[in-house]
Amino acid sequence: MTFNNKTIDELHDLLVKKEISAVELTKATLEDIKSREGAVDAFLTITEDAALAQAAALDEKGIDADNVMAGIPLAVKDNISTKGILTTAASKMLYNYEPIFDATSVAQAYAKDMIIVGKTNMDEFAMGGSNENSAFKPTKNAWDQTKVPGGSSGGSAAAVASGQVRLSLGSDTGGSIRQPAAFNGIVGMKPTYGTVSRFGLIAFGSSLDQIGPFSQTVKENAQLLNVISGHDVKDATSTINEIADFTSKIGQDIKGMKIALPKEYMGEGIDPQVKETILKAAKHLESLGAIIEEVSLPHSKYGVAVYYIIASSEASSNLQRFDGIRYGFRAEDATNLDEIYVKTRSQGFGEEVKRRIMLGTFSLSSGYYDAYFKKAGQVRTLIIQDFEKVFADYDLILGPTAPTVAFGLDTLNHDPVAMYLADLLTIPVNLAGLPGLSIPAGFVEGLPVGLQLIGPKYSEETIYQVAAAFEATTDYHKQQPVIFGGAN
């Protein structure tokens, strides 16, 4: 028996009516995970015993009819801390690390009686766009197992797209939720910076990182964001997002809404078929009453360069804590303190992580700080100002989530610059701290294309409103890969 084709609302109705139990739903989910895992390799840890025990306790307590998330299984990216459950960030450096606390987002999920069924694969320390930088294994795309699932939250995206779970958590530093969502044909939201607490998220770029939800549908995405959002005193960058219910505008029409289409998002480097798909999506939104107009974000072309200086510099600082002394991997052949540091970090970090640490350390070093890190911060301000100018006249921005559909395994992982450029459409959103959502908008040669909707800070309600209107009048979200039982 499987329930992976039912929405959260439908599952909740079954649970409340006691037509299924939380244990039955959890067992069915675990079976879905096991039956598909060999094909997609989405999980690093499956928490079968703990999940079943949690579900049994919930059945004994009873399902609260007002708590739509009670008993719903959830997969969690492996850089989000889970008490007593391996949290490796897909790195040899943390191969045996079990946190003694839960991330705030995980604690919030537990508080709503969600059932955590496992930890998902990712690029090591969230550095990568293909999931091939995992120290343990590459995850495969749900639609075509010869393609990448995107990164860094590729495991979380593939788990939802393949029908292993309905919902998962990821993190997004430069596109790591939206790009995998696009590549796998599902919904992925990077909320406004500060909307979801970063407490318990293993830090990569502290001014950029944000936890967010993956789902099959727009409403389910908003429902999960309701769970994990909220101000947290444990996170100094946590903000108060006044939106009480992210689902509140879903179902409202979008007539008269002004949506901008930046010419830079449809120019050089964008696959012509992806561009055609997005223009078709824009026409569809026009047919629903939205007003689509071309605008310019002139400094977005510098986004990738700015991002890789700022993110790598922050990573260089954040990853200093992994030294072989306190926890995690320690080199066995070290004979003194200096060797412990050098050999542990040389052996424990993967090539991409070491590349970014070196890049960041260089950017912060004496004599180069002004030329690189300071200048990157100044251009970041210009990128923010570009967005502010557009949002003075428009409700949202739309464009492709990624310049191409999912590419083949072992094609870009030896070309770091090409891999970095794959994030050129998502990175500016992180630099500006804005919310961005990717939704399925079509297919190119059998692979999903993602439509990205970007709004001003704290506009998640409006983004979900437009996304839901698009979803309700198209069937892209209903199409499923073969592994999920679909015909594609």
From Swiss-Prot:
Heterotrimer of A, B and C subunits. The active site is at K77, S152, S176. Its EC number is 6.3.5.7. The gene is gatA. Transmembrane segments: none annotated. It holds the Pfam family Amidase. One of its GO terms (molecular function) is ATP binding. This is Glutamyl-tRNA(Gln) amidotransferase subunit A. Allows the formation of correctly charged Gln-tRNA(Gln) through the transamidation of misacylated Glu-tRNA(Gln) in organisms which lack glutaminyl-tRNA synthetase. The reaction takes place in the presence of glutamine and ATP through an activated gamma-phospho-Glu-tRNA(Gln). InterPro entries: Amidase (IPR000120), Amidase_CS (IPR020556), Amidase_dom (IPR023631), AS_sf (IPR036928), GatA (IPR004412). Belongs to the amidase family. GatA subfamily.
